Structures are given as C-alpha cells and as structure tokens.
C-alpha cells in the first residue's frame, strides 16, 4: 500500500509538524556525526521552499534523571541545522506550554523551529516512550499536518510518531512520510518483497539472537544468505565444530541448528578465520581454516572466506548487508568488513542496500557510499523491516 508523502501535501501557509530523527552523538555540546541532520534536509527544504512553516521535533538519547537534560538538549543540533540551511532556526527549550505555543504562532511562512528533546517527557512517567495519548494530542494540536521522516524510530510506538499521527488523523488532518522515510520504505520494501534475483543477504555482527528473525525471514526470500561476524561461531558450534574461545551464544545453538537445517545450501558460512589468543589488536594473529584451535578466538573472516563471499556476490542483482564480518573497530580485524564494502561498491548492476552502524561506517571509511543504492539510517528499524514486521511508525502514516 503506497503511503502519502510530503510531496502530496499542500504546505503553503501551513504549520507542518515534522518528526525528524536528530538522535545524533553529542558530547559537551559538540555533535560527533551530523549524518541524520543532513538526511532530514530535503524534506525540511521542501516544506519551507513551498511556503510552509516547519515545526521540528526529535528525541535524543535516553533521559533518566534531571542531570541528563543538560547533556541531551537539542540546542546544539538547532545551531548545526541553522548552519546547514543557511538560515536561522528558532530553538524552543521546552516540550510544551505557552512558550512553545507562542513561538509556533509567531512563525512566518518559510520559518524553521525546533523544540526540545521529546524524551524530556519521559522523566514524568515515560509519557513519550509509552505513547501517552494526551501528549500525542497536544503535539498534534501545534500543526495543520504531520510529516514523519524519522525512520530510525519507526519500530517504536511513541507519542511523537504514532501518538501524533493517530491524533492528527482523528482530527481529519493529513499524515505523510518525509522523503527519507519514503526512500527507506521504497528500498528496504522492494529489496525484501520484490527483489531482483539473484538476491544475496549478508548478515554479520556478534549475536545470532539479534538476527534470528532476519535470517529466518530472508531464507524465504533470498537465494543466498552469507553469515559473518561473531555469530558465525554459534553456527560452527551447531555443526559440531571446535570454536576455541570464540564468542558463542550457548542458548542459541539449537536455533542455529534449525536455521542450518532450513537453509541448507542457501547459507554460506566463512571457511577460514583470523584468530588470536586475546581480544586485542596488538597480539599476534594467524589465519586458520575450519575449526578454531583451543586457546584462540576468531576475530575476523579470513582471505579464503573473502574470496568465496565475493564469488557469491559477483552475479547478485539485489544485496542487503547488515552487520560487520569481524571486530571492525580493531584495525587488524576490519579487513573482512572493508573487503565486503569495497566489493559491493563495484556491483554497478545490482541494488545494494547497507544498514547497521559498523557496515555504514565501513562504507564511509572506504568512500563508496555514492556507488551504493541506499544506506539505511535505521538500526533496529531496518532489522525489523527486514524481518517482515509491520513497523508502527510506518503503519500510522496515511495511505494514498
């Protein structure tokens, strides 16, 4: 079902309430990575260039104490957004009340306003995170229409996405996806529901438990599922192989056995690993094939696995990659992840979609982002979408 998008709305002279995902790393008032702010620009610009008033709101981190508020204010984000837009952004340091209402009512067409971190509302009974209906209604009352561009929180039913959307729709107001949300739905949705074949999924990361649902769902859709990262060794254990001191989720070995039985030759596991005696970048390491020797732990896929994975990928028409092949944050164990990222950049005939923090970081480090079809901004949201789940934040957007 196609969703209403911001380009379907008549925003002129309208107060457009827009949920953005400005959950960026901030330390002592300095933003570490403004990627998510940049990703929201096309929708913000569309609203203001077409004569609308953009009222933005977002969460940032988790608020558990009054002290957290100082470190997790959105004020530095408003400043960064102002720099990126080249125009003033009014920052309102509250989440409700007369100060916010007056600021909204004083806006001119083309103005941009950002109000304070929605999770400030969590100090008093988790009103944001538990989707308090009164809070959703209050925020909805600030705008004439609602645009949700925060894919990163689409898997959560919070007051600032689902609550606002439901209240808006109950008032007969329009609820639409922003351009970023639209792009995520298009690429992730098409990759899973209407992929061009061969379709190869690459799933990495430390824990099988994080990816069980995704592996299970994608085995029904993909031609091959490549498994790398720490979770490899839970599968090794399920096959009765030796894993030395490698990471293993003992309580997931039976699940891994079921996945191997279901997947058969669709599943591609690493055939060799780079191992060391300690979880340390500076100790000697070596390449071993198959079983991991006693006293050693596997920290990356080996060169043979890299070559085999490339062989599986070379004819692919759709590739979805989520999760690193090894301990990416240690330079000696980043090679598997970097090699996969580099190779995806050469697949010019394929739709290539990357999600997850380490995979995205690898792509950036390599500078191959422009050669890929789509880099997803949602961590947990991407995974749940790849599991085939309906995400509440997306479900709440009006259909066309």
UniProtKB/Swiss-Prot annotation:
Catalytic reactions on record: (2R)-3-phosphoglycerate + ATP = (2R)-3-phospho-glyceroyl phosphate + ADP
One GO location term (cellular component): cytosol
Pathway(s): Carbohydrate degradation; glycolysis; pyruvate from D-glyceraldehyde 3-phosphate: step 2/5
UniProtKB keywords: ATP-binding, Cytoplasm, Glycolysis, Kinase, Nucleotide-binding, Transferase
Residues noted as binding ATP in the record, renumbered to the chain: 211, 329, 356-359
Subcellular localization(s) per the UniProt record: Cytoplasm
Signal peptide boundaries: none
Domain of life: Bacteria
Presence of keyword Membrane: no
GO BP field: gluconeogenesis; glycolytic process
InterPro entries linked to this entry: Phosphoglycerate_kinase (IPR001576), Phosphoglycerate_kinase_CS (IPR015911), Phosphoglycerate_kinase_N (IPR015824), Phosphoglycerate_kinase_sf (IPR036043)
Residues that bind substrate: 21-23, 36, 59-62, 119, 156
EC assignment: 2.7.2.3
Single Gene Ontology MF annotation: ADP binding
Family: Belongs to the phosphoglycerate kinase family.
Assembly with partners or alone: Monomer.
PANTHER family in the cross-refs: PHOSPHOGLYCERATE KINASE, PHOSPHOGLYCERATE KINASE 1, CHLOROPLASTIC-RELATED
Entry protein name: Phosphoglycerate kinase
Source organism of this protein record: Pediococcus pentosaceus (strain ATCC 25745 / CCUG 21536 / LMG 10740 / 183-1w)
Gene expressing this chain: pgk
């Amino acid at each position: 079902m196609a969703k209403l998008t911001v380009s379907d709305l008549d925003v002129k002279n309208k107060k457009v309430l827009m949920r953005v995902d400005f959950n960026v790393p901030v330390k002592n008032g300095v933003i570490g990575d403004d990627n998510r702010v940049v990703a929201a620009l096309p929708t913000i610009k569309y609203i203001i260039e077409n004569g609308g008033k953009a009222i933005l709101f977002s969460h940032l981190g988790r608020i558990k104490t009054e002290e957290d508020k100082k470190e997790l204010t959105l004020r530095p984000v408003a400043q960064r957004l102002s720099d990126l837009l080249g125009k003033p952004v009014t920052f309102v340091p509250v989440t409700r009340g007369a100060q916010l209402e007056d600021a909204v009512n004083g806006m001119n067409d083309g103005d941009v306003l950002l109000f304070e971190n929605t999770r400030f509302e969590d100090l008093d009974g988790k009103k944001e995170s538990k989707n308090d209906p009164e809070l959703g209604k209050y925020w909805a009352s600030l705008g004439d229409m609602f645009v949700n561009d925060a894919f990163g929180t689409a898997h959560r039913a919070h007051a600032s996405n689902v609550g606002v959307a439901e209240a808006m729709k109950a008032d007969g107001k329009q609820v639409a996806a922003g351009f970023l949300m639209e792009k995520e739905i298009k690429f992730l949705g098409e990759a899973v529901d209407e992929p061009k074949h061969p379709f190869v999924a690459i799933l990495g990361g430390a824990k099988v438990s994080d990816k069980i649902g995704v592996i299970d769902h994608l085995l029904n859709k993909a031609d091959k599922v490549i498994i790398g990262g720490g979770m490899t060794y839970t599968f090794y254990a399920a096959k009765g192989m030796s894993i030395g001191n490698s990471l293993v989720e003992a309580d997931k070995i039976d699940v891994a056995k079921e996945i191997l039985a279901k997947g058969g030759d669709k599943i591609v596991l690493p055939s060799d690993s780079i191992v060391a005696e300690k979880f340390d970048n500076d100790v000697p390491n070596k390449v071993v094939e198959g079983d991991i020797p006693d006293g050693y732990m596997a920290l990356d896929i080996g060169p043979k696995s890299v070559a085999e994975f490339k062989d599986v990928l070379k004819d692919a028409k759709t590739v979805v990659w989520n999760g690193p092949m090894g301990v990416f944050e240690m330079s000696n164990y980043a090679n598997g992840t970097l090699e996969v990222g580099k190779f995806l950049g050469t697949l010019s005939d394929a739709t290539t979609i990357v999600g997850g923090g380490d995979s995205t970081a690898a792509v950036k480090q390599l500078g191959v982002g422009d050669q890929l079809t789509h880099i997803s901004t949602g961590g947990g949201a991407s995974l749940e979408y790849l599991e085939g789940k309906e995400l509440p934040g997306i479900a709440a957007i009006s259909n066309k």
